[in-house]
A protein has these predicted regions:
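Active-site recognition of the HExxH zinc-binding catalytic motif
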Residues: 89-102, 190
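Glycine- and acidic
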Residues: 73-77, 170-178, 235-240
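Extracytoplasmic/secreted envelope proteins and their assembly/folding machinery
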Residues: 92, 186, 190-193, 251, ...
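Auxiliary, metal-adjacent structural segments of Zn-dependent hydrolase domains
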Residues: 1-70, 84, 105-111
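Non-catalytic terminal regions of proteins
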Residues: 1, 236-299
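Post-HExxH zinc-binding segment in Zn-dependent metallohydrolases
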Residues: 29, 102-171, 175, 179-226
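Extended hydrophobic/aromatic segments used for targeting, binding, or gating
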Residues: 200-258
Length: 299
């Protein structure tokens, strides 16, 4: 959206040169994503300060005038994005897109090429949204189930409901591809965003850099297990709203299940025409049926 990337003269960041891009239109700012700087993919993300300012201004503009003085916008920011760890996770999300561009540039391009289909997706179809809700409820149940056989059974049910939704809703091959592409692109990035925070929180020998120790919004990842649970719960809340955010969460949840049933799945995820749902189907088809405490097999 701007001019060529240029090395910032007479300055370095952590001993390395860094780049800037002149904007030709102040109304057209770069999105949070990955950019190609020369022949290198790199993450791009608003600074934490600018993100906060943009949130305050944008949120207030969406409110009716009479509500603007009384809605606690600053409190909402702290609840949604206030922790520094959350910002670091978002940066990991965008860095993962750069990794996708490095490892599988063709797949990244195809997934981005599919993005305009969002405007034609049947977000407002009531029957489709009801089917999506059932699908996501079962996906959440699979992710949170304790016994592996129960989780596998829920995962198989999720895949069956997905197939039935597409069939009964006469979803075109183009739209099916759109779902799969966006889950691969954004679902995997969401997975990376959350898992890296969870792993940091579980580390027993983590010590933050001194420079971040004085940040009052940084909690050394101690709040990340709670954040993980909150983010998993969002899987069930993705219907009855337009926009592709649901693919972030449905893709992420499939990644969590793949970790459970086939830990080597990540190497396969880069191959052409390999989708998360296909990897999951293969992973759970051999799992034993779930048997309840009463000895009854759950179908």
């Amino acid at each position: 959206r701007g001019g060529p990337w240029q090395v910032v003269p007479d300055d370095v960041f952590q001993g390395q040169p860094y780049y800037r891009q002149p904007l030709t239109d102040p109304e057209q700012t770069p999105e949070n994503f990955a950019v190609l700087v020369g022949d290198r993919w790199a993450a791009t993300l608003q600074t934490s300060e600018y993100s906060r300012v943009a949130f305050y201004g944008g949120f207030r503009e969406e409110l009716p005038t009479f509500l603007r003085p009384i809605v606690p916008v600053r409190l909402l920011w702290r609840l949604l994005m206030g922790d520094t760890e959350t910002y670091i996770g978002v940066l990991a999300h965008e860095a993962f897109h750069a990794y996708q561009g490095t490892v599988a540039p063709g797949r990244l391009a195809a997934a981005e090429f599919a993005a305009p289909l969002e405007s034609r997706y049947p977000w407002e179809n009531e029957a489709t949204e009801q089917a999506w809700q059932a699908e996501l409820d079962v996906l959440y149940a699979a992710v949170t189930a304790a016994p592996d056989d129960e989780a596998a059974q829920y995962a198989r049910q999720f895949l069956a409901l997905r197939e039935e939704r597409r069939r009964s809703g006469a979803l075109s091959a183009e739209m099916v591809d759109y779902e799969r592409q966006r889950e691969w692109l954004e679902g995997l990035a969401k997975y990376a965003e959350l898992v890296i925070q969870q792993e940091a929180g579980r580390s027993t020998d983590y010590a933050p850099l001194p420079a971040i120790g004085d940040d009052p919004a940084f909690h050394a990842y101690r709040t990340r297990e709670r954040f993980w649970s909150q983010q998993l719960a969002e899987v069930r809340r993705m219907t009855n709203r337009s926009g592709e955010t649901r693919f972030y969460y449905s893709g992420m949840a499939q990644g969590v299940l793949l970790d459970r049933f086939t830990p080597g799945w990540k190497a396969e995820a880069w191959s052409e025409d390999v989708w998360l749902e296909d990897l999951l189907a293969e992973a759970v088809q051999q799992a034993a049926p779930y048997t309840s405490n009463h000895g009854q097999t759950k179908l």
